[in-house]
Amino acid sequence: MRHQCRVPKLGRPTDQRKAMLRGLTTQLIREGRVTTTKARAKALRDEAERMITLAKNGSLASRRRAIGYIYDKQLVHALFDKAQDRYGDRQGGYTRIIRTVPRRGDNAEMAIIELV
């Protein structure tokens, strides 16, 4: 039984789900906003906020953890350079999820997730 299991399955095996979330996190940090399904946006929010919190910490160990997660190494360095200035006064809540119109093909709930 999956009582109180907080990991959303997203209809994929574990390795595919982790790779998808890594890719979405990388894209969100690079572009600032991503259009995806609502369930993926909610799962992405946790990962993106974890990476921004690591960047705010700014230690070498945090930087290495972020490099191991985010696909683009230069993007990690850019995130660590500007995270303290941009999010220094915030204690979480670095992203915003905005619901949009359903997807035309399968009527899936869509959302835009963006960095605040």
Swiss-Prot record:
One of its GO terms (molecular function) is structural constituent of ribosome. InterPro entries: Ribosomal_bL17 (IPR000456), Ribosomal_bL17_sf (IPR036373). GO terms for biological process: translation. It comes from the Bacteria. The keyword Hydrolase does not apply. Keywords: Ribonucleoprotein, Ribosomal protein. The keyword Ribonucleoprotein applies. One of its GO terms (cellular component) is cytosolic large ribosomal subunit. It holds the Pfam family Ribosomal_L17. Belongs to the bacterial ribosomal protein bL17 family. Part of the 50S ribosomal subunit. Contacts protein L32. This is Large ribosomal subunit protein bL17.
